[in-house]
Amino acid sequence: MRKILFAALLLALTMTAALGEELPKAPVNMEIPPEAIPTQAEGELETYGLTFPEEMPLAARNFVLTARAQFEQHPFEKLPKANEYTQWYYRDKREIGWCSVFQIWCAYHSGLQLVRYKQDVEVAPGDCISAMEGRVGNVYYAFEEHGRWLQCDQVEAIPKPGYLVIYGVRGSTPYTHVAIVESVTELGDGVYELTTVEGNINSTIKRMNYRYDATPKKKYYNMSVVPEGEITQENCQYTLQKDTWYITGFCQTW
């Protein structure tokens, strides 16, 4: 038994040495969702000219501004799969998809309450929340069980800044990618123009600008490009990431 324990200790030390520099440590035990940290006061974050609904809570506003600040820090920059967001969350250098980890990082640093799927925790109607789930499907399940999920075929599925948007792939999965809604413009007839901040789009942080049809003729064809002559947002990707993607629904963070 002693030989086994010694061998295990030696292996752990060898792996630590192989990693080289010390890994950035998450401020909490990431197996357990942390309590919301105090959100920054209004005026302490760059607003980038964004305006928000009057009823939008400060933490939800900071969620958007924190995500935007990360984009401005790494605009369209190709990041490794093991990056500052994944190492903060997983506490190691694993290479893995990180779209949800990005929103978790932004939520934690904005003061949102983080919840998990199948976690016995009470969420009040006025609480600002996000899901501490690395898998996009579990983000959906976490919001659904707390009554904060808006399916796209529901009349009340109206996007708002600070919500999460979950994308699906036609003929494959309804939960392939998650992003943060930065701004929403209602165009009439159930059509909205969305600008989003998205982690891990081709290994980058991008701002995407496109149109969402809440009442499409075909259920899985609810995204379209903004006509070239009607583009008003700057520094965005204006093409759809993939033609087979569609919006599955929205997570009500607030």
Q: Which ranges hold each PLM region?
A:
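N-terminal Sec-pathway targeting helices
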Residues: 1-7
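Aromatic- and glycine-rich peptidoglycan recognition patches
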Residues: 22-30, 44, 48, 154, ...
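Residues that form generic nucleotide/phosphate-binding pockets
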Residues: 66-70, 142, 253
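Surface-exposed intrinsically disordered loops and tails
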Residues: 80-88, 119-156, 211-244
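N-terminal capping segments
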Residues: 23-118
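...with weaker cross-activation on analogous glycine-rich loops/strands in unrelated enzymes
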Residues: 113-206
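Intrinsically disordered, low-complexity Ser/Thr/Pro-rich tracts
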Residues: 1, 15-26
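Bacterial N-terminal signal peptides
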Residues: 7-14
